[in-house]
Design a protein with these regions (language model features):
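Extended, charge-enriched "interface" segments that sit outside catalytic cores
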Residues: 1-13
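Histidine- and acidic-residue-rich, metal-dependent catalytic cores
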Residues: 10-263
Length: 263
């Protein structure tokens, strides 16, 4: 039992440690690019190898951080959510790794958007919105300079495309949008709605899912959204109203179920 509890604690600690690592990765990306990209690639591999062997546990640990004011958790949240969908769809390992890298650095182009636009709490002017929307192309330029794989660049450049062709930057439609970007789009909006931002409180889970389904077939690929919907709600329902001791017991049970070597 002690080993099981220690394993659960390690997984919880790993989430926080990984988020802190992402903070450092983003900070060092342009000043020390080669080493930073290698570090990020190893980080994605660790997420794939460790977190995704226990998707329920990972989703719980992540959900406990939703609403955090530490915005670098967003990159990890959307990476994990995207990889969970990819895992369920049984995508090849190379695709999953590239999806993770693209998700981790999806907003790298925002560093070229002035803070007065990016952090503005009032509605943007049309000129400000047009400038902000350039972050996808800026990000792809940075990714190409850093020699990101094409599949990772797909996520960075196309994550704001919409299934009906009304997104940006290229107004791609349907399956012309890379699958990795279609997966990421659902994860990105889910986390944005679920998280506390300077201008809003997090929405309840049921409300978030209702908003996502309003975009089924317009904003989101229906099949990807259906997969995400199947993966997301069960654990959240389990966790409602649990106190600290009950949550710890649930975590331990998940470790027992998903890490057979410990049982």
């Amino acid at each position: 039992i002690r080993r099981q509890r220690e394993a659960a604690a390690r997984i919880e600690a790993a989430f926080v440690d990984t988020a802190r690592t992402i903070h450092n990765v983003e900070k060092n990306l342009l000043t020390n690019p080669t080493e930073t990209v290698e570090q990020a690639s190893r980080l994605v591999g660790q997420i794939v190898d460790s977190f995704l062997t226990a998707p329920d546990l990972a989703l719980h640990v992540m959900s406990d951080k939703i609403g955090s004011e530490e915005m670098y958790f967003h990159s990890l949240n959307v990476t994990m959510l995207s990889l969970m969908v990819a895992r369920d769809l049984k995508l090849p390992g190379e695709v999953v790794q590239c999806l993770g890298m693209g998700a981790l650095f999806h907003d790298v182009g925002c560093r070229k958007v002035p803070d007065k636009i990016r952090l503005k709490t009032e509605p943007w002017t049309q000129a400000e919105r047009n400038f902000y929307e350039l972050h996808c192309e800026y990000g792809a330029e940075i990714g190409r300079e850093l020699k990101f794989a094409p599949l990772a660049l797909d996520v960075i450049e196309q994550h704001h495309e919409m299934f009906d062709g009304s997104g940006y930057p290229r107004q791609l439609r349907g399956e012309a949008i890379p699958l990795s970007a279609r997966i990421f789009a659902v994860a990105d909006v889910f986390d944005a709605l679920s998280s506390r931002r300077p201008y809003k409180e997090p929405l309840p889970f049921d409300k978030v899912m209702a908003i996502l389904h309003e975009g089924r077939g317009s904003h989101f690929d229906p099949s990807v959204l259906d997969t995400f919907t199947r993966l997301a709600p069960t654990l959240y329902a389990q966790l409602q109203g649990l106190d600290e001791a009950s949550t710890r017991a649930l975590l331990t049970d998940m470790v027992q179920r998903h890490f057979d070597v410990l049982v």
